[in-house]
Amino acid sequence: MDLFTHVIIAYLISFGLTLGKSPVYIAAGSLAGGLPDSDILLMPLARRFPLLRHHGITHSILGVTIFAVGGAILGPMVVPGANAWLLLLFMEIGGLVHILLDGFTHFAVPPFAPFSNVELHLDADRAVNGVTLAMSLTSFFLLVYERNTVPLADWLITGWLLLVTYLGYLVLRGVARYIVGKEMKKEGYTAVIPTANPFHWLLVEEHEASGSWSTRFAQYTIGRGIRSPQKAIGVEAPPPATLPVTTANEAIQLSYRPAMQRSRWLASTYRYATVNSSANGFRVHWFSIEFTVFGRAPGIRVDLDARTGEMHLERSWFRLRDLANPTLR
């Protein structure tokens, strides 16, 4: 989830546990709710030390405990009179909330690293969801603005209402994920991808072996079933070597491996491609169907010369509407 949502939910849970009466420990919990994402500062070291990657060791029980211990030691120096044990408790809770929220999405986190590589990902929400981001920004404004401008009783009511709203949202997402999981098995798919709308999901099945790859997916709407035609795409190994390239399928076959080599991240997500004709041949858009943000998807644009087979590759964010893929909007 986005950083604002992590901090706000950790804040509200700390608020609920203290009944809104201990600002120091509420602040400690909300700070800890955001600290695991400080691993973004360690990215230059991640190539040498993989545990320092984003969603690595800082997103584990060990990592958040280290943060909590540090807060318990430094906290009383910053806020005289603060109880170190309570600081430890609320910072541990805030950090664990961060892990659980990330695992609730289609990102994966290693809660038991470095002792185990087992990952947690429930695929119940998007990692970056415009709905929750808007909720969090609004919540942040209300909590900060009202703190010193309205009576304390009104501020407490706002806090409780926001806490109930967020918990209700998470319950809605969890129940929807359970329902769509049953439909996934019924329809013969192997995975689900959440969209921004908790009632719309993608059902996915992917196969990859000996250089060949294929995927199929369809949009599922809770209460209505599969509402769009299934989309499918596949690549054989080895790709065709004949020139000139005359069909869209040949363009897909030839561009697949260069595109995946250009973006290892794209190669590790569920992906799809669309093909359009161009002046010299074909333009192929390979993009992720798993990580879409505000109607755009990251991917690789491949301009393929039909006569020579030469390719020009460029990273970009594509508007899904431009790619004529209404399934993914």
What are these regions (language model features)?
Residues 175-329:
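C-terminal regulatory/interaction regions
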